[in-house]
From Swiss-Prot:
UniProt-listed InterPro entries: Man_deHydtase, Xyl_isomerase-like_sf
Protein's gene: uxuA2
BP GO terms, sorted: D-glucuronate catabolic process
Protein name per the record: Mannonate dehydratase 2
Gene3D superfamilies: Divalent-metal-dependent TIM barrel enzymes
Purpose: Catalyzes the dehydration of D-mannonate.
Gene Ontology terms for molecular function: ferrous iron binding; manganese ion binding; mannonate dehydratase activity
Pathway, per record: Carbohydrate metabolism; pentose and glucuronate interconversion
Reaction(s) catalysed by this chain's protein: D-mannonate = 2-dehydro-3-deoxy-D-gluconate + H2O
Keyword Manganese listed: yes
Length: 356
């Protein structure tokens, strides 16, 4: 397993110099953030990003994300041009040596929370999702803006988008995802670029918008849309783990044995009610997920791909992008790597004893 770290480019207060100093972190997960959604990424800009990262002794391990244009999700006639642009981006990424692309198929909004700075008992602040508060929000009023959201929409555009999604069912969205997968995965396969779809976060409908990448059954359906190791998953423990019916270690073993786990997000969450949760430190005792069992499942399948510590709390007076500070994520990376080292050495010890 390669430990990686999310970096939001030159505007990120967490610099590459800082990331390079985290023990065990060797890769960067990033993207190009100044290209409008739907346009092809120029090869030159990809190389510029890659070289900047490599100049700091790190590798560009994953692109997260290449956003999927809403016309594709809506199934509009214009989707074919946007899909061609997407395929061009994949070809340019492959030419630059990038081999994994993370993406999602969530309508309009990316990951969603009700508050970005919920005060925890220890004095740190964290992201929180309270279903009742989200139900009372009107996203058209701009009450909340999150790091993963496309904020380029004007009020009229956002309202129009919601109207277009008004009558979309989950099956409609599945049909549009299938169209996208069957067009894009062959191109990715040809370029040897592994695609990794991120689960919906949270994994249930919000603001009346359908969400479909939510559980084992739907992940299984996704991988069968086009059967290829290049049509894989970004297995996010936090996104899926807020549903108590999602057994994360079991999902890792099940899809890992099929060769479908292409990328992993590791974080803990604390379930505080029905469809409500708060982010916690990565430590098992601080949340609802057993991070040891999750890492053990990855060790059991001999996972050799990239993983990253996901959202962290804001601690020690740090300010910056909510969920993406340096300190708590760095603690998470070292904690996760420590478990990985222990499990790896134990596995070798058992193998040696069995061979005596």
């Amino acid at each position: 397993m390669q430990m990686t770290f999310r970096w939001y480019g030159d505007s990120d207060p967490v610099t590459l110099e800082y990331i390079r100093q985290i023990p065990g972190v060797t890769g960067i997960v990033s993207a190009i953030y100044d290209i409008p959604v739907g346009e092809a990424w120029p090869y030159e800009k990809i190389v510029e990003l890659k070289e900047k990262i490599e100049n700091h002794g790190l590798s560009l391990s994953v692109i997260e994300s290449v956003p999927v244009h809403e016309d594709i999700k809506l199934g509009l006639p214009t989707r074919d041009q946007y899909i061609e642009n997407y395929k061009t981006t994949i070809r340019n990424l492959a030419k630059a040596g990038v081999k994994i692309v993370c993406y999602n198929f969530m309508p309009v909004f990316d990951w969603t929370r009700s508050s970005l700075d919920y005060a925890l008992e220890d004095g740190s602040t964290a992201l929180i999702y309270e279903e009742e508060k989200v139900r009372q929000m009107n996203p058209l009023h701009g009450e909340l803006k999150l790091p993963g959201w496309d904020t380029s929409y004007e009020d009229g555009q956002l309202k129009n988008l919601f109207q277009q999604y008004q009558h979309m069912t989950e099956e409609d969205l599945w049909e549009n995802l299938s169209y996208f997968i069957k067009a894009v995965i062959p191109a990715a396969e040809n370029e040897q670029v592994k695609m990794a779809i991120h689960p919906d976060d949270p994994p249930w409908p919000i603001f009346g918008l359908p969400r479909i990448i939510t559980n084992k059954e739907n992940l299984e359906r996704l991988i069968h849309l086009y059967d290829s190791s290049f049509n894989g998953l970004c297995l996010c423990s936090g996104s899926l783990g807020v549903k108590s019916t999602n057994d994360i270690p079991e999902l890792i073993r099940y899809f890992g044995k099929k060769g479908k786990v292409n990328f992993v997000h590791l974080r803990n969450i604390k379930i505080i009610g029905e469809k409500s949760f708060q982010e916690s430190s990565h430590r098992s005792e601080d949340g609802s997920l057993d991070m040891y069992e999750i890492v053990r499942a990855l060790r059991d399948i001999d996972f050799a791909g990239p993983a990253r510590p996901d959202h962290g709390r804001m601690i020690w007076g740090e300010t910056g992008k909510p969920g993406y500070g340096l300190y708590d994520r760095a603690l998470g990376a070292v904690y996760l790597n420590g478990m990985w080292e222990t499990l790896t050495k134990e596995k070798k010890r058992i193998a040696l004893e069995c061979n005596k």
